[in-house]
Amino acid sequence: MIVAAGTKNPNKIKAVKDAYRLFGFPAEVVPVGRPAGTPPQPVGLEEVVKGAVARAKAALEAVPGAEHGVGVEAGAVHAGGAHLDITVAAIADRGGAVTLGFGPAFQIPTAFLPDVLKGVELGELAERYFKKPSVGYREGIIGVLTGRRVTRYQLNLAAVAMALVPRLPKNAKLYRT
């Protein structure tokens, strides 16, 4: 199965490949860059979901032989009086169906919050503060905050795995529309 991933980030590409493998789908993942017009740091759940869906659909269109397009997007959401960074995955197929999955969310450091809410990428802020270049392509800010006990790859993997749940053959009847 050919899967187009709307990213060039090795973390996200590995998460897509491993999530498909987890459920027994042998996937050849073809990376495609982020579509134009997608903000680097979406704010609000609708914007994060919209970004993941846009990535998935654009990736699917960019790779003619792909069965699925996958978009993974992280962004800031407000819930329970806190601002959280959440990862959302969207999987689009040639029939027009889109399935969604969310990964674990963590509270955004208050020191970074004003800039994040203005649209500055959380990874960029972490790189500057922690003096770690390309942190988003490695462990992510969550990896820095947790001493690598939890990494960005794990958040991405969880989100893609959850987006695959409705696509599992054993669940076909449950999710039929």
UniProtKB/Swiss-Prot annotation:
Q: Which residues form the signal peptide?
A: none
Record bears the keyword Nucleotide-binding: yes
The note on the cofactor says: Binds 1 divalent metal cation per subunit; can use either Mg(2+) or Mn(2+).
> Which reaction equation describes what this protein catalyses?
XTP + H2O = XDP + phosphate + H(+); ITP + H2O = IDP + phosphate + H(+)
Essential cofactor(s): Mg(2+); Mn(2+)
Keywords associated with the record = Hydrolase, Magnesium, Manganese, Metal-binding, Nucleotide metabolism, Nucleotide-binding
Instruction: Drop me one GO molecular function for this one.
Output: ITPase activity
Gene Ontology annotations of biological process type? nucleotide metabolic process; thiamine metabolic process
Annotated membrane-spanning segments are: none
Give the E.C. number(s).
3.6.1.73
Enzyme kind, highest EC tier: hydrolase
* A Pfam family the protein falls into: NTPase_I-T
Q: Indicate the family of this protein.
A: Belongs to the YjjX NTPase family.
- HAMAP family in the cross-refs: Non_canon_purine_NTPase_YjjX (MF_00648)
Q: How does it assemble?
A: Homodimer.
Q: What does the record give as the function of this protein?
A: Phosphatase that hydrolyzes non-canonical purine nucleotides such as XTP and ITP to their respective diphosphate derivatives. Probably excludes non-canonical purines from DNA/RNA precursor pool, thus preventing their incorporation into DNA/RNA and avoiding chromosomal lesions.
- The entry's protein name is Probable inosine/xanthosine triphosphatase
Species annotation? Pyrobaculum arsenaticum (strain DSM 13514 / JCM 11321 / PZ6)
Classification from the root reads:
Archaea, Thermoproteota, Thermoprotei, Thermoproteales, Thermoproteaceae
